[in-house]
């Protein structure tokens, strides 16, 4: 019996589609298989001999029409009418959720029960989620290079024993995102932890973009010497927390060499160092040295310790646009000898807060050498120094000796009812300064200078300016005149070092309140953790009012990104990004340079930048009066093409801060010059199509 007419029509339609699919193009379900896709039969394709038909785009042929990715393909085709190929860099970020998973998680989100399956959700949707402590690492389970812990279940190893038998417990490398415990309750011997999350480019727990957590090191140990060499150094987007280091320890000596040094965009916290320790000498060498942008905090150092000799060498020095907070140093300690060498020195536009130093201590010898010296503008406050101390001998050498004026406040120095102390303050200087209160008994105040009342020439100020270690990387900003064929110029490292994540389908993203508390609760980001800081920072930036002439939106789904671009520019749009990271970190030569749209006229664009969040969130803003360029990037020695870059030139910089990195790198002032930069990996710019 002949098949029904509608069945014949369906079969004919399938045959035509197969004819239009070239042999080299495979659907996603075939691309993972070990066999080649079936070729259409010549008998089914008489029209192939008569005319050539453009093949459909691969992204239009998903394995299942019900997946989140397939739904977005249809959405794009309805909204964007520029008839351009789908941008591969953008479509690679789409949700990998299968149709059943997307439906199940959407139902849970609608019922407010997504948290009950959060681990499965994170894994299936390719999200960034805090790790959960797994099995403990011990000396017997590792050869010292971290291999055993790295192979432990997701969430990182513990370190319960840490060589509690009195021997040395070296631990050289650890690259996962969570470490529960190391060297607790050990007796005698020495602990050594060399490297934790050092400068990985990206991935789940690396210093390049991981969310690292170290919970406890050496708690309750007796007579053990310990050292921690490096924690999340050299990374990009450092997001880490260290909860406790040698709490309740007795005897021995401790050292922490470096924490989040040379990091970019930090959100780091250190909870407790040698809390209630007894008779220990310890040193913390560097904390977020040479960091660029972000927030950092240190909760307590040597609090309620007994007979301790403590030193903290540098905190946030040579950093750019860092908001720092140090809550507690040596408070209520007994017989302590404390030294803090430098805090926020040579920083650019810092926001520094130091809340308490040696308050309520007994018979302490305290020394603080420098706070925000040689810094450039910014706002700083120091709340309390040796307040309510008994028998204290304290010295504070320098506060607020800045290169350029900032707002600095010192609220209390040596205050309290007990006059049995000897305290000296060597120098307090700066513009816009206030010193609210200090004890009149037993306190020697040598010098207070208000720089606005002093005649300091620009030449003298420039002469004492230190080298700008926080200057932007060469090539990060440049002038429009540099975009000419044949020009040799430095290319910055444009690699995306944030952890890999995917968009959520809009159907799910819309059911998650874009609120710091709600997102943190859902993904298990506890207060005080790095993930909580990251979430709060992103939500706050999205809530910031736009600048003059700027229209901004935080897009929590791929559909939101498309909607904003179409709303700003119309439906004839194209998304562009720099093709790869080739050439970054060295000199390159420019090949063909072309303005987009054609002619390089002044235009309006939409730029979208990744924000650090559990799932992909883009900060998109419509920027008026720009020019956008495409350029072939060539190797200097061979003139061979190695990359294809996209650059944007901002023609109106009048609302930019005078301390913006572009003016530090190029000179000039806001409104007096244009500033250009490459579109970094992971970011994108939208313009009207040619």
UniProtKB/Swiss-Prot annotation:
Residues 134-163, 201-232 are annotated as: Disordered. The keyword Signal applies. Expressed in panicles. Glycans are attached at residues 178, 225, 317, 379, 432, 450, 601. Residues 1-26 form the signal peptide. The lineage of its organism: Eukaryota, Viridiplantae, Streptophyta, Embryophyta, Tracheophyta. Residues 154-163, 201-211 have a biased composition (Gly residues). This is BURP domain-containing protein 14. Residues 477-689 form the BURP domain. InterPro entries: BURP_dom, PG-associated_BURP. The gene is BURP14. Residues 135-153 have a biased composition (Low complexity). PROSITE patterns: BURP.
């Amino acid at each position: 019996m002949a098949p029904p007419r509608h069945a014949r029509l369906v079969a004919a339609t399938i045959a035509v589609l197969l004819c239009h699919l070239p042999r080299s193009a495979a659907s996603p379900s075939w691309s993972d298989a070990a066999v080649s896709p079936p070729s259409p039969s010549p008998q089914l394709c008489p029209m192939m001999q008569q005319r050539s038909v453009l093949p459909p785009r691969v992204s239009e042929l998903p394995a299942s029409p019900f997946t989140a990715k397939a739904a977005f393909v249809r959405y794009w085709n309805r909204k964007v009418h520029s008839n351009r190929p789908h941008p591969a860099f953008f479509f690679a970020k789409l949700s990998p959720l299968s149709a059943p998973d997307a439906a199940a998680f959407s139902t849970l989100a609608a019922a407010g029960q997504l948290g009950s399956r959060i681990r499965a959700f994170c894994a299936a949707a390719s999200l960034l989620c805090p790790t959960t402590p797994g099995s403990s690492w011990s000396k017997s389970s590792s050869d010292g290079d971290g291999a055993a812990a790295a192979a432990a279940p997701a969430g990182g190893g513990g370190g319960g024993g840490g060589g509690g038998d009195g021997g040395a417990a070296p631990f050289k490398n650890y690259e996962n995102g969570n470490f529960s415990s190391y060297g607790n309750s050990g007796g005698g011997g020495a602990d050594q932890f060399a490297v934790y999350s050092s400068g990985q480019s990206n991935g789940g727990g690396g210093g390049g973009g991981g969310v690292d957590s170290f919970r406890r090191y050496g708690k309750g140990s007796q007579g053990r010497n310990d050292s921690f060499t490096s924690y999340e150094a050299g990374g990009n987007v450092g997001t880490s927390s260290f909860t406790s280091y040698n709490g309740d320890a007795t005897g021995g000596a401790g050292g922490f060499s470096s924490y989040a040094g040379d990091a970019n965009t930090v959100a780091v916290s250190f909870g407790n160092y040698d809390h209630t320790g007894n008779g220990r000498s310890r040193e913390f060498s560097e904390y977020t040295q040479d960091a660029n942008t972000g927030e950092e905090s240190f909760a307590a150092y040597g609090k309620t310790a007994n007979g301790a000799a403590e030193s903290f060498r540098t905190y946030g020095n040579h950093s750019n646009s860092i908001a720092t907070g140090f809550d507690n140093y040596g408070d209520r300690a007994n017989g302590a000898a404390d030294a803090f060498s430098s805090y926020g020195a040579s920083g650019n536009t810092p926001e520094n807060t130091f809340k308490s130093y040696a308050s309520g201590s007994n018979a302490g010898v305290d020394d603080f050498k420098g706070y925000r010296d040689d810094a450039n503008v910014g706002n700083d406050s120091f709340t309390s120094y040796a307040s309510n101390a008994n028998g204290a001998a304290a010295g504070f050498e320098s506060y607020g000796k800045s290169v350029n004026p900032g707002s600095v406040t010192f609220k209390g120095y040596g205050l309290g009812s007990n006059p049995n102390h000897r305290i000296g303050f060597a120098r307090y200087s700066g513009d816009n300064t206030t010193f609210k209160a200090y004890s009149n008994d037993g306190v020697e105040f040598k010098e207070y200078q208000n720089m606005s009342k002093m005649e300091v020439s620009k030449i003298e100020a420039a002469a004492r300016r230190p080298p700008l270690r926080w200057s932007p990387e060469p090539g990060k900003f440049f002038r429009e005149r540099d975009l000419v064929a044949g020009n040799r110029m430095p290319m910055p490292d444009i690699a995306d070092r944030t952890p890999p994540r995917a968009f959520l389908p809009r159907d799910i993203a819309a059911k998650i309140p874009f609120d710091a508390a709600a997102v943190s609760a859902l993904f298990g980001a506890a207060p005080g953790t790095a993930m909580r800081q990251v979430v709060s920072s992103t939500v706050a930036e999205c809530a910031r009012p736009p600048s003059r002439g700027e229209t901004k939106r935080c897009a929590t789904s791929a559909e939101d990104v498309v909607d904003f671009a179409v709303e700003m520019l119309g439906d004839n749009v194209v998304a562009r990004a720099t093709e790869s990271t080739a050439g970054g970190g060295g000199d390159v030569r420019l090949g063909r340079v072309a303005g987009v749209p054609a002619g390089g006229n002044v235009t309006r664009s939409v730029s979208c930048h990744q924000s650090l969040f559990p799932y992909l969130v883009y900060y998109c803003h419509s920027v008026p009066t720009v020019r956008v360029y495409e350029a072939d990037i060539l190797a200097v020695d061979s003139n061979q093409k190695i990359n294809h870059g996209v650059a944007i030139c901002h023609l109106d910089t009048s609302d930019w801060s005078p301390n913006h990195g572009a003016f530090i790198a190029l000179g000039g002032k806001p409104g007096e010059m244009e500033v250009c930069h490459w579109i970094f990996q992971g970011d994108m710019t939208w313009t009207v199509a040619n």
